[in-house]
Amino acid sequence: MRVRWPMVALLLSLGAPSVGTRPQDTTARTHRYRTLEDRFVVRHPASLEEWRTRAGWLREHILATAGLLPMPERTPLNAVVFGERTHDDYTVSKVYFESLPGFLVTGNLYKPIGSGPFPAIVSPHGHWNYGRFENSAVASVPGRAINLARQGFVVFTYDMIGYNDSRWYPHTPGHTFHDREFGGRRENLWGLNLAGLQLWNSIRSVDFLESLPMVARDRIGATGASGGGTQTFLLSAVDDRIAASAPVNMISLHMQGGCLCENIPGLRLDTDNVELTAVFAPRPLLMVSATGDWTNETMELEYPEMQRFYDLFGARDHVHAVRVKADHNYNRESREAVYAWMARWLKGAPANVEVKEQEFRPDPLPELMVFADRPRPAGVVSTDELTENWIAAARRQLAGGNQEAVRSALLHALGFERQQTAGAQSSSKPVIVLATEDAGVEKAVARAGLAVHRVAFTPFDAKAAAAISMFETYNRTAAGQRVADLVTALSNRPGAILIADGDAGLAGLLAAAVVPVTRAILDVGRFDLSSDAAFLDRLYIPGLRRAGDLRTAAAMAKGNLVVHNAGDRFSIEGQATQAGKLTPEQILQLLKKWGGS
C-alpha cells in the first residue's frame, strides 16, 4: 500500500454522554508529516478499469492544483519568430509569444532543412546554471536541439520562468521583481503558482508548434531533464497531444523534486512522481536515470513499477528505461538514448535503432537570446499585473464558466476524489457532530437528548510544518485538515446533524460539499467572503478561491444548512443566512424541531 498522508486523525468519543453532561474530548492521534524525500510505495490498481478512473482523476488533479481547472482561455499567442540563422543541416530562430495576455514565453526554434511535415519536440531545460543555453559535458540543451533538428525534428527550447529571456520574473522566493517576491499565499489561494504557470507555458508551447505548417501535429514529443523532467511528465500527463515522452533524471520514489516549480501546493497529498508519470500510459515513455542521483534505483524499483501500469494495457513494449553511469545529467549517452526513442516512436524507426550524436557548435549567445538586441515588447505585464489579471480571469470563469469543472476543482483543493453518497442513518434519532468551544452551545446540545460526538481536531504543528520544504505539496494546511476531520466524522455517522462555529463553522460548510449533511447549524464568525486577507487568516487552503470557495461549497451541499453570524460580507446565492450570532436557544429550538426531545 502506498505510503500516504495518514488517514485523518479525527478522534471522537465512542459513546453518547448522558443528558446534562459535557461531551468528552478524545486525545487526537499525532502523525508524521509527509516530505518530498519520503520513500513512497506505489499502490497498483486491481484492473485497467480502476486505473482509467484513477488516471482520469490524477490528470484532473494536476490541472486543478496548477490553477488550470477550468482551463484558462487560450488567448492569441501573437507569436514572433525572427533572427533565423541557417546552417548546413538545420536552422535556429528566436521566438516569443504570449501564453497569457502580456506574459511571454521565450525560446529558440530549431528546424530541419526542408518543408516537412516533421515530427516536433517541446524541450524544457531544467535547473542548469545557464538554462536553455547550458552547454557542458554534463548537459547541453542546444546540443540536443541541434542534433534532433539534424535528425528531422522541429524542436522548441523555452525558458523556465526567471531564466534567460524570462529573467524579469523571479524563479524562486527571495528573487524579487518590483520589490516583491513572485508568488505566495494569496496567489496560492487563486491557484496561481510557479509550477502551474510553467505547465501552462508548456501547453501553449505545444499550441505554438501545432501552429507551424511544417509540424506533423500527431507526432509531437517532449523531453527535459531534472526540473525539465518534471515539466515533461506533468505536460505528458495532461496533454493528449504528446505522442512520446522522455523525462530524464527525475522519476523517483524517494525524491519528488526540490524546487518550487516542481511542487504545486496540494499536488502530492496522496500520490507520487511514478503514479503521476504513469498517467501517460500506454503512450511511449522512456525513463532515463543515472547512478549518481535520486534515480539510481530506477532499473530495480521505479521501472518495474511503471511496467506494471503498462501491463494493464498490454503495452509493456511502450515503456523502457536506461541507466547512465554518471551524476545528475543530460549528457551525450542520455541524449543518444532519447534520440533513438524519439526516432522509433515519432519517425517509425525499428525498435533496435541506434542514433549517435554528431558534433555540434551552438551559435553565440547574442544570436540565441531573444532580447539581446531588441527591447522587451510593450504590454508585457509585471508580476503584480499578472496576479491581478489572473484573479480577474478566474472571477469571470466562476461567474459564467464550466460549473462542473469548478466543483471538481473544489474537491481537488480539499483533497478528495469525489463527492460521497449518503449512507443509511443508523438509529431513529440523529447523532450530533459537534465542533465548538462555546460552553453555552454544548449545554444546549446536551439538553436536546441526542447522542453527541465532539470533534477532536488533528493538532497542527506549525513549527514542524515550517521546517518541511514544500510542506503544502504533501500535506494539508491547518484549515484543510479541519475540513478533512469533519468529513471523516460525518462520513462515519450518516444522517448526523453538524453543529460548528468559528473556523470550524467555515470548515463545516466546505465539508458539506464533500459528504452529505442532512442538517447543519453553522456559525461563520462574520467571515468576510470578499477578502483574501480573511481567507489567509482563517481559511487558507491553496486553490480554494480559484474554485469558488464557500460559494461553490454551498451550491454543492444538498442538506438543510442554517448559517448564522454571517455579517454583511457573507452573501451566498441561494443560501439563507442570519446576521446574528448563534445562540444556545436557537440551537435547542432547531434540534427539537429536527428530532430532539
PLM-predicted stretches and their roles:
Residues 110, 125, 158, 223-225, ...:
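Generic beta-strand/beta-sheet core signal
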Residues 223-262, 266, 270-313, 318, ...:
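Catalytic-domain carbohydrate-binding cleft regions of carbohydrate-active enzymes
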Residues 133-140, 174-178, 189-200, 222-233, ...:
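Alpha-helix capping and helix-loop boundary segments enriched in small/acidic/polar residues
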Residues 113-211, 250-261, 434-492, 527-538:
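Cap/lid segment of the alpha/beta-hydrolase catalytic domain
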Residues 20-104, 281, 288-451, 458-494, ...:
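Alpha/beta-hydrolase-fold serine-hydrolase catalytic core, especially in secreted/extracellular enzymes
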Residues 204-269, 489-555:
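Primarily recognizes the serine-hydrolase "nucleophile elbow" in alpha/beta-hydrolase
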